[in-house]
């Protein structure tokens, strides 16, 4: 910067680059990188880009000094190859990791314990979002309480009066499986915003047309589906 005019030009260029970087940094990871390569590798990709930019700038100023840092990306790449092959979060004790995926919405894990129970964990893994067992339907957890929902209708009310069900927040199908066992093969609409969770449910929780033919799944926002469905 040699004068006021060039200072304004440089400042404008910096702000333009900053704005472009903000847009790329906002949309590229969320829409492309994280769903395709995961959070950890996304960090490594952006770290590599920043290193290349910094290295190029330093090389223009002092090539000899820049060459001292060539080893850094090589070491980081080798460490990533050898240390990042395992799961982001290890499974619980006495459990096996069956499925791990980072979608556009969630970090998804499915684990199976030594008694054959399968569990759906999302993101930080503090809560169980769905549970499944080949021979059991009721687990003494939160989902069991939803079976009482029809009895909030005006009495007298009998189980055969339950004609259909809408679930917003389907996860991998614990609630519809329970409803089918209690109230029969009633039509069920299940809404889950994350299509990867629906796919995992079909593969690992029997949430498919063969085992739950009366269940229709929607990979949509719940508010949108409420406005689109004409059932009451």
Give the ranges of each region predicted by the language model.
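Membrane-embedded alpha-helical segments of integral membrane proteins
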Residues: 10-60
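Membrane-interfacial entry segments at the cytosolic side of transmembrane helices
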Residues: 62-75
């Amino acid at each position: 910067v040699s004068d006021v005019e060039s200072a304004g030009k440089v400042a404008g260029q910096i702000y333009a680059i900053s704005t472009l970087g903000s847009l790329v940094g906002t949309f590229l990871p969320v829409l492309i990188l994280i769903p395709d390569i995961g959070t950890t590798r996304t960090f490594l990709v952006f770290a590599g880009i920043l290193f290349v930019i910094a290295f190029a700038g330093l090389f223009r100023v002092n090539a000899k000094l820049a060459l001292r840092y060539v080893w850094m990306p090589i070491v980081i790449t080798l460490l990533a190859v050898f240390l990042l092959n395992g799961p982001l979060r290890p499974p619980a004790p006495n459990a096996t990791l069956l499925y791990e995926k980072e979608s556009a919405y969630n970090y998804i894990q499915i684990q199976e314990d030594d008694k054959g129970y399968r569990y759906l964990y999302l993101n930080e893994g503090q809560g169980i979002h769905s549970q499944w067992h080949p021979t059991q339907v009721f687990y003494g957890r939160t989902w069991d309480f939803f079976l009482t929902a029809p009895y909030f209708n005006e009495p007298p009310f009998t189980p055969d009066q339950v004609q259909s069900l809408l679930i917003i927040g389907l996860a991998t199908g614990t609630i519809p499986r329970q409803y089918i066992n209690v109230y029969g093969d009633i039509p069920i609409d299940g809404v889950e915003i994350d299509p990867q969770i629906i796919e995992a449910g079909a593969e690992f929780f029997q949430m498919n047309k063969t085992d739950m033919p009366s269940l229709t799944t929607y990979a949509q926002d719940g508010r949108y589906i409420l406005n689109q469905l004409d059932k009451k």
